[in-house]
UniProtKB/Swiss-Prot annotation:
This is Guanylate kinase. GO terms for molecular function: ATP binding; guanylate kinase activity. It comes from the Bacteria. Belongs to the guanylate kinase family. Essential for recycling GMP and indirectly, cGMP. Residues 3-185 form the Guanylate kinase-like domain.
Length: 190
């Protein structure tokens, strides 16, 4: 089996994590794909568990792994480090899975530079900026200042959408999930 690396990026609140969770519950998702768990220095949110959503590490631990060339991609986002370790990708490739990387545009650029055509990329867009703000507020996990900062960064993030192989506007969740499933199916058969 040729394993592919699927990069998925989106502004915070566009529905990336929800779509991925739903996709991984489908027959094709659960049998053929695995999400690489990233390292981060941010604090866990309520309900998040170390080594399930992220590997939560200190800044010193992250920087040590970074100095050992242990990441395929990393970035500092909203004052915290995020990165995907080489060891995590090796672990998933050994299982024979297609790998999904839930990363930002900077990490996507780094990953495409390493893996070339083996890396497929999807950018998920919100239907509008107003809807995006509503979603962020509804999550009830960030302060108003954090939401305002995230909204300031959206234009920069969206400006990189044309670097991706596939753009998906997450307006209707069911339709977006169906489109995402089709994209994954088509790209493992090609």
């Amino acid at each position: 089996m040729n394993n592919y690396i699927f990069i998925i990026s989106a502004p915070s609140g566009a529905g990336k994590s929800s779509l991925l969770k739903a996709f991984l519950a489908t027959d094709i998702g659960k049998d053929n794909y695995a999400v690489a768990i990233s390292h981060t220095t941010r604090e866990p949110r309520v309900g998040e568990i170390n080594s399930r959503e992220y590997y939560f590490v200190t800044v010193a631990e992250f920087e040590q792994l970074l100095s050992q060339d242990g990441f395929i991609e990393y970035a500092k986002v909203f004052k915290n480090y995020y990165g995907t370790s080489k060891a995590e990708l090796d672990r998933l490739l050994a299982l024979g899975k297609n790998i999904i990387l839930e990363i930002n545009w900077q990490g996507a650029q780094q990953t495409r530079a390493i893996y070339g055509d083996r890396a497929k990329s999807i950018f998920i867009l919100p239907p509008s900026l107003d809807e995006l703000r509503k979603r962020l507020e509804k999550r009830n996990t960030d302060s108003k200042e954090t939401i305002d900062y995230r909204m300031e960064q959206v234009q920069s993030e969206i400006s990189h959408a044309d670097e991706y192989d596939y753009l998906l506007v997450n307006d209707d969740f069911s339709q977006s999930l169906e489109q995402l499933c089709k994209y994954f199916e088509q790209n493992i058969q090609s």
